[in-house]
Amino acid sequence: MVAAATQPSETGTLNSVSAGATRMAGFSARLDADPEQLWLGVVGTLIAVLVAGVVFAREVVYDRFIWQYFWGPVAADGNGAQCAVIRNGDVSYLFSTAECAAAERAGEIVAYPGYTLVSEVGYVLVLLLALIGVYFLLRRLDIGDSRSLFYALFPFMLFGGALRTVEDAGIAALAAGSEPLIGFPVSALIISPFIYVTVFAMTLAAVGVGVALERRGVVDAYEYPVAAIGTLLVAGSVGYLTSLAVTTTYVSLRPQVLAVVVIGATLSAAATWLLIERFAPAINAGTGLMGLVLLWGHSIDGVANVVGLDWMPALGAGPNLVP
């Protein structure tokens, strides 16, 4: 199936890659510098500035920037706390909103689970640098110019959601007085936003394995082992969660929620894609069914949020979730 998916209408994909390479070459010529070296220089400079800031201005750079907006929120989430606070050089976890508010009034450095404008801007910059790095990597490996890689990576999209639920199960285990599979601080690797880095690294490793197997003649196409690794990771995560639902009281299986989310997302994605195909086919011309897959992925996210926040009681699945 992966091989067949590479055949129809790849011209748009190839043209996009070629256009990107042309623009990059022009940019490099204007700066009279190798673009990969330029990228490494930017990344290295940013890291050096942060390290220097931590060493020479720890409270400002680490406590009030890195910790408060990036690490602290993850630490609070990983411990099931309402917030995390730096007190006299040590980190404390508070489990009531009143305590968190009192800590803020006292002028202490407080970090809440979730995102802030500062952290979101930081993550956007990291994402942009990462995308540029991925482009250079694909170009160096001479891969990624066909649709087959896109479909091979699809299981990793599902794996990301399943792995994040493993962390949720760990929080539920802590609340029930049980030991989670992955305890803090290791669990930080599967808490947003660090989970994106974790899944990216695992995906990158899978691609590396696939490319190595292809170039050694073990497989005909690197996409096959990539898809197989992703599928095994999804199956392992879902299997673990299912076993918890069967053997513990703090994790429950809600098949009606899964059914509504999958059916609702599939119908909305299909309807949207068909409407685009009917009234604005130029949008789908370069992507084909890849656009449908992308729409379905976003629809899963959207429908799951609506169901979790508003429809849980109606489905007999317990109270609505709290964001």
Go through each PLM region and give its residues.
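Charge-biased, low-complexity intrinsically disordered regions
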Residues: 2-323
